[in-house]
A protein has these predicted regions:
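Sec-dependent N-terminal signal peptides
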Residues: 4-14
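Active-site-proximal alpha-helix that buttresses catalytic centers in soluble enzyme cores
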Residues: 21-301
C-alpha cells in the first residue's frame, strides 16, 4: 500500500475503534496452562436462520476443530431470535455468549480461545469484546481473535480471494455488504476505496442500510457507463434465504435503473482463502496476549 492509503487506514482504524491497536506481548496461550487447567476453543456466530446458513457456520467450526484437534470445541450465538427459532424447531439449545461462559466456568474451564465469524468490527463485535473483557475476571486466560477485515493485509487478501472466486470480467462486480448506521460503515467505505486504489477495474462496494449506499452505487455505475452488474454476497454466515432476499431487492432496483443483473449464489464461506484468514487471526490470538484497556491502565499506575 502507498503511504497515503496507510495513513487513511490508520484514520479508519481510530474511527472504528479497532482494538488491534492495543499493546500485546508474545505469550502462547496453552503454554500458560498448569496441571488441572482445562482449555476450550470457542466459535461465536450471530446465528443461522436456515440449513444453508448452518452449513456456512459449520465450515467455520470445522476450521477451528481442525486447527486445534485436541482441544474441546464449543459454540455460541449472539442472536436470541435465531436461538429461539432453532429451539422452537427442535434443534436443541444453543447458548448465548454469556450463557456459554457461565457454563464453561461451572465445568472447570480455565483457558478460552475465541474466534467470531464477524466480517468487520461491528457493533456485535464490540459487544463481544466487552463480554470477553468482563470474563477475564472469571478465567485464567481468555483470548479473542480479530474479525475478518482488521489490518491492511486483510483487506488486500480478502479482495484478492473474492475476485479470484467470484469476479466476472464481462460485468461490473458489486460486493453486497450488510451495512448499518454504525461505525462499521467506515470499514466498507475503506474497502471500496482500496478497490479503486488497487486498480480493481469495475469493482464496487455497496451496503444495505448504510454507506456506500445503493444510490451512490448507481451514480458510480452511470459515470462508468456500466450496462451489466454482477452481485456478489459479501456475507459469511447468511444462508440462501437471506442472501436471495437481499439480492432480489438489489436486482429489482438496479433493473429499474436500466441494468442487466446477475447474482452469485455463493458467499465468502465457500472461499478457502477467507477461512484461512480467520484461522490466522485465531492463531495470532493464541500466540499473543493483548492487553485490555483496563490492564493497560493498571500497568501505568
Amino acid at each position: 500500500m502507498n503511504r497515503f492509503l496507510t495513513l487513511l487506514f490508520i484514520f479508519f482504524a481510530i474511527c472504528t475503534d479497532i482494538s488491534a491497536q492495543e499493546a500485546e506481548m508474545e505469550q502462547h496461550l496453552f503454554d500458560t496452562m498448569r496441571d488441572g487447567d482445562k482449555a476450550a476453543v470457542v466459535a461465536i456466530h450471530i446465528g443461522a436462520e436456515d440449513a444453508d446458513a448452518k452449513q456456512n457456520i459449520e465450515k467455520f467450526n470445522a476450521m477451528l476443530r481442525k486447527a486445534y484437534p485436541t482441544i474441546d470445541f464449543r459454540e455460541a450465538w449472539t442472536s436470541r431470535i435465531l436461538i429461539q427459532q432453532v429451539h422452537s424447531n427442535g434443534g436443541g439449545n444453543i447458548p448465548t455468549t454469556d450463557e456459554l461462559f457461565s457454563q464453561l466456568n461451572k465445568d472447570g474451564y480455565t483457558h478460552l480461545l475465541i474466534q467470531s465469524s464477524n466480517i468487520v468490527n461491528s457493533t456485535d463485535m464490540q459487544i463481544l469484546r466487552y463480554e470477553v473483557d468482563a470474563a477475564k475476571e472469571t478465567f485464567k486466560q481468555i483470548r479473542l481473535g480479530e474479525p475478518l477485515l482488521t489490518d491492511e493485509t486483510d483487506y488486500e487478501e480478502v479482495l484478492k480471494a473474492t475476485a479470484a472466486a467470484y469476479g466476472s470480467e464481462k460485468e461490473a462486480n458489486v460486493l453486497m455488504c450488510e451495512g448499518t448506521h454504525g461505525s462499521e460503515n467506515a470499514q466498507y467505505a475503506l474497502l471500496d476505496y482500496i478497490l479503486k486504489v488497487q486498480d480493481y477495474k469495475s469493482w464496487f462496494v455497496a451496503t444495505s442500510g448504510g454507506y456506500p449506499s445503493l444510490s451512490s452505487l448507481v451514480k458510480q455505475l452511470k459515470k462508468q457507463k456500466v450496462k451489466k452488474v454482477h452481485l456478489i454476497p459479501f456475507l459469511f454466515t447468511a444462508g440462501s434465504k437471506a442472501t436471495s432476499a437481499i439480492a432480489h431487492e438489489w436486482a429489482q432496483q438496479l433493473q429499474r435503473a436500466g441494468y442487466k443483473v446477475t447474482t452469485e449464489l455463493h458467499n465468502l464461506s465457500d472461499v478457502d482463502a477467507i477461512i484461512d484468514i480467520f484461522e490466522n487471526h485465531l492463531r495470532h490470538a493464541e500466540m499473543f496476549h493483548r492487553y485490555s484497556p483496563k490492564e493497560l491502565k493498571m500497568m501505568t499506575r
